[in-house]
Amino acid sequence: MAFPAFAEEPEQPITGSCGEKLTWTYYQSTKTLTIDGNGNMPNYPADKYEGSIAPWRNNSNIDNFLEKVVISHGVTSIGENAFFWCDKITSVTIPSSEKSIGMGAFYSCKALTGITIPNGVESIGEDAFSNCDGITSISIPGSVINIGYGAFSSCGGLTNVTVSEGVKNIDEYAFYYCSQLEDITLPDSVTHIGVNAFFQTPIYNYDSEWNVLYIGNHFIAANQNISGEYTVQSGTKTIADSAFSACGNLTDITIPDSVVSIGNHAFDSCGLKSINIPKSVTNIGECAFYTCFDLKSINVNTDNPAYCSEDGILYDKEKTEIIRFPQEKTDTSFAIPDSVTSIGNDAFLYCSGLKSIIIPDGVEKICDNTFFDCSALTSITIPNSVLIIGENAFERCRESMKVNYIGSTEDWGEVIGDGKNVLTNANIIFCCGISAKHSEGGKNILVKVINIADGKNVILALYDGDRLVEVQQSGEYSENSREITFTPSKAYTNAKVMIWESLGSLSPVCNVKKLK
């Protein structure tokens, strides 16, 4: 007897959503997960104890078997930890619509044998492909701006990396401990290489046999035994983070005009006595000259568009930020220029010879570690324009230090905040002074009188270059009029605001405020 044939029922996939406009579909027969839709995938925690992990990772029928991932065109980001430790995935398809690959997205996908990153991806996140031992070769397209911290670290099978022209930043540890990586191509477009980006790869295996290490036109590292003078190769584009770190016997360095970037901590703990910055350098990283205890001067080419120097001190081009006061500079006192509005991180760190510093009115921020371990500092003048004092800005300074504060006790209470113990215990002297600024429209000049008794005269002197063009007098002010507004009747290039005991006095009673 014959039995009728029945059609096989189609497989019912497992489905769900992963974002407002994205859906996912998993077919058990092919072990394939497809993500469709338009927009960004959400970020997920790596561990379920930290929150809701990616839905396919939360389903043992998928997580234990998933081999193939297809991301359809329209998806614009792969979320953080989306396929974290999916160690059976062998293939991933990424569309050209993709802009970013999130942190840990394919972390420890050990069976993944290859990956094509399409042109259009702009960012590869921290640890995105870390510990993917099956990947043997990777090409980074020029659309990628940033290769994140540890992005391909510990990829034990990786032998070849090609970074295309256009890529700008390679973060710390990006290819760390890729134990078979010997073939590396870097373009001239790269302007930053983080510390240990290629450390523990075969190019470091014989560090005792080389003095310096380059990859293409990028200076990666110097052997700490290097001594005396060294000239960076002509054509070099970047000096990587910590490239000369701990080269204590390096006393002189020549940087060619081709270099555009000096990395973070690039010359940390070197024996340099002076350094010349060429006009080509447009980026100097944080702490580039950290603990250079013999450094007396930093000299910048006058044609440099990003930086300048005066008397061996490093500033930004407009002299609005003081970046580094050399640690071995012999000055015992220093008045920061009136143009400065910000004092950078570590700007005076370990300047143990300085005893007195005057900060001008107009400075708004003293950054982290600015005066750290200025152990001889006994006096500092701080105006009430300062709104922020960073962490450890005065750490390891003398607790008996005298602080001349041009402002009120209320102002001081607001700026000092919590945790700035040295300044909390310092000898605070509330000084007289004036502050002045242009009104929002730019024509009027607003003057504020600070800690000065009633009955004094406020004088405004206007100049065209060095030529005095106009003088205005406020008349005597009282407690009820501590702010005065001047309206100049003539054009001027700079101005001075002064307070006098009387018009017959020979000198002002406090600081003279200059304005442009």
Task: Cite the ranges covered by each PLM segment.
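Sec-dependent signal peptide cleavage junction
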Residues: 2-12
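Structural signature of tandem-repeat unit edges
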Residues: 6, 32-40, 63-77, 87-100, ...
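Short proline/glycine- and polar residue-rich coil/turn motifs
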Residues: 120, 166, 475-482
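Exposed aromatic-hydrophobic patches
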Residues: 446-449, 481-489
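Beta-strand signatures of extracellular beta-sandwich domains
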Residues: 457-462, 496-498
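Solvent-exposed serine/threonine-rich low-complexity stretches and specific carbohydrate-binding patches
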Residues: 469-479, 512-514
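Edge beta-strands of extracellular beta-sandwich domains
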Residues: 503-516
